[in-house]
């Protein structure tokens, strides 16, 4: 019975729960790795040993957080749970493929962990650039295992993407058009399209790297007529859409949370929000080389990528101002989820502004590979994606479990986390402007003060993570049942009960077209 329910599951709610648990577990691993990084950098001098082990930790931290925490929770967890409920579908379009999408992830995670256990580990950075990732600088099986891990995670995401696109297009009741689906459903569909178009390019790039390493091909080796810059183009053609994949479902969740706790029946500018997400998704594919301003591109090429990158700020601004307009005049409830959403809007905007700074190719040549870049993308990931996940989690926790969290503790948790992440990442802007380079385990004494403060901040964040685990335990142990949910007529996922039944519908849905 247990095996049938959890290993062979074809139920979107159970698979969503599995994704959530896996993502939370991987999140603990990723947090542990980040604490190792900040412990090493907390003061000058060496803590872990040499730079190789440090870079293995940095690389693993990135892969774990991106592929095994943010994506499984946002797309696999919230996506599986909410999309069928929001469109009135009985389940996903391909329930068994859905199960396989999940079960590809633990073996993938295992391969990534194995890569750090053999030889010296993969100390390449998450970009895995050759020639550093080639078979001379990284002899041994580590990088090969990492590549296989990425292949599995990629297949999992591609299958999931096919499933979500099919579900959202084909499994709505006939009376509902695409423009009547909630924004979270839109965000997941756009994310799925991005995954479907970008992951095959990554697969091609890392497969060529695999053959360069093991079969004596020279795709990325100038000695045989190859070019390492080709790898960078292939990687970033995936890598840039990937960062939008990480944030788009968060946009969808924030839209729902802000609308709900403003007491509004719909978000401000629904069509504008949809258009903005589609624009961001499209533009995300034509700006990849802004990660490569330092490789020596023509000035006109740099001018194009600078301009195209800046254009992305426009649809992003549409979203930010629409969220603020949704708040305007609303009966605002200062719930924990609302605090996360407001924190998201504020901090994501700061991350976006530093992104505009970096989009200037001339400035980026100075700031590339410094802590300014680290600060920028952690503002949009550690305070964008993670705040969206936390907001979505405390908002929908009663739906998933049928129990309520302690609201006071949830607010305290938000406060600790808010202070921690800002104390960790705000000083890194100063370090970057002062020229401290990324991916080094040690630094000149001049950088000590800000690094020490940054490391203190990371331990405050760790406290928040531990408090969250306790909060979840407390809620599941206390079993405070959900009494009532307001605004269900415009928030369809809540109308089936808390939690909804194992099989949402006993018979096909009928929705009268208006």
UniProtKB/Swiss-Prot annotation:
Residues engaged in binding heme a3: 376
Binding site for Fe(II)-heme a: 61, 378
Record-level Gene Ontology MF annotations: cytochrome-c oxidase activity; heme binding; metal ion binding
EC number(s) from the headed UniProt entry: 7.1.1.9
Residue spans, topological domain Mitochondrial intermembrane: 41-50, 118-140, 213-227, 287-298, 358-370, 434-446
Catalytic activity: 4 Fe(II)-[cytochrome c] + O2 + 8 H(+)(in) = 4 Fe(III)-[cytochrome c] + 2 H2O + 4 H(+)(out)
Binding site for O2: 244
Pfam families: COX1
Positions bearing the 1'-histidyl-3'-tyrosine (His-Tyr) cross-link: 240-244
GO biological process: electron transport coupled proton transport; mitochondrial electron transport, cytochrome c to oxygen
TM regions (residue ranges): 12-40, 51-86, 95-117, 141-170, 183-212, 228-261, 270-286, 299-327, 336-357, 371-400, 407-433, 447-478
Binding site for Cu cation: 240, 290-291
Pathway assignment: Energy metabolism; oxidative phosphorylation
Keywords: Calcium, Copper, Electron transport, Heme, Iron, Magnesium, Membrane, Metal-binding, Mitochondrion, Mitochondrion inner membrane, Respiratory chain, Sodium, Translocase, Transmembrane, Transmembrane helix, Transport
Bilayer topology annotation: Multi-pass membrane protein
Mitochondrial matrix side: 1-11, 87-94, 171-182, 262-269, 328-335, 401-406, 479-514
Cofactor binding remark: Binds 2 heme A groups non-covalently per subunit.
Broad class of the protein's primary localization: mitochondrion
Annotated positions binding Na(+): 40, 45, 441
One GO term describing the cellular component: mitochondrial inner membrane
InterPro entries given in the database record: Cyt_c_oxase-like_su1_dom, Cyt_c_oxase-like_su1_sf, Cyt_C_Oxase_1, Cyt_c_Oxase_su1_BS, Cyt_c_oxase_su1_dom
Entry annotated with the keyword Signal: no
SUPFAM superfamilies tied to this protein: Cytochrome c oxidase subunit I-like
The protein's required cofactors: heme; Cu cation
Subunit structure: Component of the cytochrome c oxidase (complex IV, CIV), a multisubunit enzyme composed of 14 subunits. The complex is composed of a catalytic core of 3 subunits MT-CO1, MT-CO2 and MT-CO3, encoded in the mitochondrial DNA, and 11 supernumerary subunits COX4I, COX5A, COX5B, COX6A, COX6B, COX6C, COX7A, COX7B, COX7C, COX8 and NDUFA4, which are encoded in the nuclear genome.
Name of the featured protein: Cytochrome c oxidase subunit 1
């Amino acid at each position: 019975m247990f095996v049938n329910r959890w290993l062979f599951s074809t139920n979107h709610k159970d698979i969503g729960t599995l994704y959530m648990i896996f993502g939370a577990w991987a999140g603990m691993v990723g947090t542990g790795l980040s604490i190792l990084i900040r412990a090493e950098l907390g003061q000058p001098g060496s803590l872990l040993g040499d730079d190789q082990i440090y870079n293995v930790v940095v690389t693993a931290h990135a892969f774990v957080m991106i592929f095994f925490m943010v994506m499984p929770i946002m797309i696999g967890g919230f996506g599986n749970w909410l999309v069928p409920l929001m469109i009135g579908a009985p389940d996903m379009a391909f329930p068994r493929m859905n199960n396989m999408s999940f079960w590809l992830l633990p073996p993938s995670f295992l391969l990534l962990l194995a890569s750090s256990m053999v030889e010296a580990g993969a100390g390449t950075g998450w970009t895995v650039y050759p020639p550093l990732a080639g078979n001379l600088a990284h002899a041994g099986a580590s990088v090969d295992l990492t590549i296989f891990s990425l292949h599995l995670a990629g297949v999992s995401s591609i299958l999931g993407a096919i499933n979500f696109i099919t579900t959202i297009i084909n499994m709505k009741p006939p009376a509902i058009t695409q423009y009547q689906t909630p924004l979270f459903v839109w965000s997941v569909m756009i994310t799925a399209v991005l995954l479907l178009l970008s992951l095959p390019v990554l697969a091609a790039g890392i497969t060529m790297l695999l053959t360069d390493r093991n079969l004596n091909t020279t795709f990325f080796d100038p000695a045989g007529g190859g070019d390492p810059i080709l790898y960078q183009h292939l990687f970033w053609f995936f890598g840039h859409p990937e960062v939008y994949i990480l944030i788009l479902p968060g946009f969808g969740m924030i839209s729902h949370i802000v609308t709900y706790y403003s007491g509004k029946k719909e978000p401000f500018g629904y069509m504008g929000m949809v258009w903005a997400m589609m624009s961001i998704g499209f533009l995300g594919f034509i700006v990849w080389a802004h990660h490569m301003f330092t490789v020596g591109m023509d000035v006109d090429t740099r001018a194009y990528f600078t301009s195209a990158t800046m254009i992305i700020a426009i649809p992003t601004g549409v979203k930010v101002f629409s969220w603020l307009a949704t708040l305007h005049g609303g009966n605002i409830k200062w719930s924990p989820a609302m605090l996360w959403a407001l924190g998201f809007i504020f901090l994501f905007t700061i991350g976006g502004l530093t992104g505009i700074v970096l989009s200037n190719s001339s400035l980026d040549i100075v700031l590339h590979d410094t802590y300014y870049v680290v600060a920028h993308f952690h503002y949009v990931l550690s305070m964008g994606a993670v705040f969206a996940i936390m907001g979505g989690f405390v908002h929908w926790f009663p739906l998933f479990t049928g129990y309520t969290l302690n609201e006071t503790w949830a607010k305290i948790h938000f406060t600790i986390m808010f202070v921690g992440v800002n104390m960790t990442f705000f000083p890194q802007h100063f370090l970057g402007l002062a020229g401290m380079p990324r991916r080094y385990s040690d630094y000149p004494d001049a950088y000590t003060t800000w690094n020490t403060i940054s490391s203190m901040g990371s331990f405050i964040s760790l406290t928040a993570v531990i408090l969250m685990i306790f909060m979840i335990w407390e809620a599941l142990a206390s079993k405070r049942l959900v009494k009532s949910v307001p605004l269900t007529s415009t928030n369809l996922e809540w109308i089936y009960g808390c939690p909804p039944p194992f099989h949402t519908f006993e018979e096909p849905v009928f929705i009268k077209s208006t």
